Amino acid sequence: MKAIPLSYIARNLWVRRVTTLLTAGGMALVVFVFATVLMMGEGIRATLVATGQPDNVLLLRKGAGAEINSGIERAKAAMVESLDGIATDGEGRRLVSKEPVVLINLPKRSNGKPSNVTVRGTSALGLELRPQVRVIEGRMFRPGTSEIIAGRSVASGFRGAALGETLRFAQRDWVVVGVFDSDKTAFDSEIWGDAEQMMAAFRRPVYSTLVLRLNQREALAGLKAAIEADPRLQLDVKPETQFYAEQSEALATFIRILGLSLSVIFSIGAIVGAMITMFAAVAQRVGEIGTLRALGFRRGAVLVAFLAESLLLSLVGGVVGLAAASGMQAVDIS
C-alpha cells in the first residue's frame, strides 16, 4: 500500500496552524498539570524524608501522630534519657534533645497575610543531632535568652524574621540573631530558640517530642522494647526517617489525587476538542481526500495519514507540556 508522505502531513498542520496550536495547547495543558502535580507530591515527600537522620529516633506521646499534638512530661523525659542504647557526645552528654513545638502566625513579606510557622525549642544538642543544619548568617542563639534563629525560608518569606529583626509572639519580643540552612529540608521553614525559654513563654509544662541518637542502629529494638515494657511512659518510638515519611504521605497522596482528578477533567476536554478538530478537518477536506484517492492512495493510507496528524499533535502538546512543567523546578512553593 502506497503511504502518504510525512512531509505532506506536516504541511497540512502548518497550513491549519491556528487550529493546530489550539489543539496542541489543550493537550499541553493536560500534560503540564499532571506532571506539575506529580512533581509537587514527590517534592513534598523528598523534603520531609530528607529531614530525618537514619541514626535518630523520635518519641511522641502514644497516639499523638504529630509533634504539635504531643506532650511528654519532664519526668518521662528523664526516664528515657537514662535508658541504654543512647549515644553520647565528646563530653559524655547523652544525645537527647527535649523539644517543645508550637505553631504561630506571622505575616508574609509578599502580601502581609498571616501564615503558620513552626517554632521549635531546642539546644546545642539539637543542632548536633541534625548535622544538615548550618547557621549561614549571624550566630547561634544563647541559652537562657530571648534569642532565636530562623530557617532560610522563614527569614526570606516572613516579616520581622530576617537577621537583626525582632519578632513578637507568646507575649515576648524575640531577636533574630541567626539564619540557618538545613539543605532543603523541612527545618528551613522553622524558627528555633532555647527550649526552656520557649516553654516559659508559651506556658507549656511539657515537651512535645524527644529526639535522640542511637549508639548503633541495632539498639532501636532494645530501646523500643524497654519503653513499651514501662507502662508509665506511654510513648511511640519511631526512626526519624520513618516519622517524616509518614507525615509526608497524607499530603502527598492528597496532592496526587487532586492532580489526577484535574488531569482527567482536562483530558476529557482535550480529547473532545481534538475529536471535534479532527472531525471538522475531515469534513472540510472532502475534496482533498477525493484528490488523494484519485492519485491512487487507498482508504487505509488516508486513514493512517489522519491518525498520524493526531499523533503528531499529541506529541507536540506532550513535549510543550513537559517543557513547561520542567520550568516549575525553579519555583519554590511554601
Where in the sequence are the language-model features?
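Hydrophobic alpha-helical transmembrane segments of multi-pass inner-membrane transport and secretion
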Residues: 17-44, 252-288, 311-320
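Mechanotransmission and gating elements of multispan inner-membrane complexes involved in transport
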Residues: 51, 87-90, 107-114, 140, ...
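Short beta-strand boundary microenvironments
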Residues: 115-157
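Transmembrane alpha-helical interface segments in multi-pass membrane proteins
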Residues: 279, 286-333
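Short, membrane-interfacial amphipathic segments enriched in basic
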Residues: 1-7
